[in-house]
Amino acid sequence: MSAKRAVVLASGGMDSATAAAVAHNAGYEVYMLHTSYGQQTEHKEHECATAQAAALGAADFLHLTTDHLSKIGASSLTDDEMAVADADMESDEIPTSYVPFRNANLLAMATSYAEANDCEAVFIGAHSEDFSGYPDCQPAFFEAFQQTVAAGTKPDTEISINAPFVDWSKTDIAERGLELGVPYEHTWSCYRAEAPACGTCDACAFRLQAFQNLGERDPIEYAERPSYT
């Protein structure tokens, strides 16, 4: 009997690296998909995603490059004219780092990749602290996209959209990843810089807070390492 297969959207960050480990631990052959879409730290993210795939022994690693999201703009991740804001961990506003409808674009590519390779699942590392600010990280979005996949693929295709951390905090993810031996030294979260991480953008803040909550030291280098606990 052939092993079950899953595509993992591999951003290079700690959430997707942990999602890949969870999929692998559940018995899936992992097909990792990394996309460069014009984000400011795309080279570092690609480097990290490649290292993660090697460490996990991924069955395949696909790197896609697309520029339409950066041409559309309206996000500080892709638009040089928009500054990446300092961390505001209490805000309920949609942050400037939101890339309009990005996850639908990425999941569409992942579904194509999955169907072409007879994969039965797609994993994405979105979590509860994401959907407080990003509308395309909400459980309702993934439920709706699941219906789109069912309607838009071949009749005999069955692909489940899995967001295993959708009810988890960043701390929960870090704790599980440490249990699974995720190489967090080969992950990147910073929105601003490729080395060292800034330590003060939203992504750095939530990441540092997760490790601090667990009493662990984040293994990557930071320009600043504030306390977020």
Swiss-Prot record:
Keyword Nucleotide-binding: yes
Source taxon at top rank: Archaea
Record-level Gene Ontology MF annotations: ATP binding; ligase activity, forming carbon-nitrogen bonds; zinc ion binding
Pathway info: Purine metabolism; 7-cyano-7-deazaguanine biosynthesis
Pfam families: QueC
Family matches, as InterPro entries: QueC, Rhodanese-like_dom, Rossmann-like_a/b/a_fold
Protein name as it appears in the record: 7-cyano-7-deazaguanine synthase
Annotated source species: Halobacterium salinarum (strain ATCC 700922 / JCM 11081 / NRC-1) (Halobacterium halobium)
